[in-house]
Amino acid sequence: MTTIELLEKLTSPAGVAGEETSSFEALKGLFSLYGDVSTDVSGNIIIHKDGKGKHILLDAHLDTIGFVVTGITDEGFIRVQKVGGVDMRTVEGMELTFHGKEDVYGVVCTVPPHLSDGESKVSADGTCVVDIGMIKEDAEN
């Protein structure tokens, strides 16, 4: 497995804080290639490999920053609230993936330059709306 393939396997699963199960399972699967994998009551992954070599500790966060859905507007836009250290200055126009029964893709809405008053401000409360190209009824399903 190349370094790029390894990084893709580690970063592809959705693992927003509080919903890390898919990231956790992916990591356990990768580590099982190297030894016996178990977990403790705190959710730590432990790999045991027979031998007399040195022990190592890999200490890292498993979760990622992201958003949680807080509502759907009458026009079908998705209202979201940041989870974790999202820098709201960087999200305008960003593509987001909503994980549900099926993945749904959307783009964080921005005010077009010709409609802007030139005083565009970053969301102070960590909220924004996302256009998924659906009407409200379809978005709710």
Model feature map: region roles:
Residues M1-N141:
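N-terminal hydrophobic/helix-forming segments and targeting peptides
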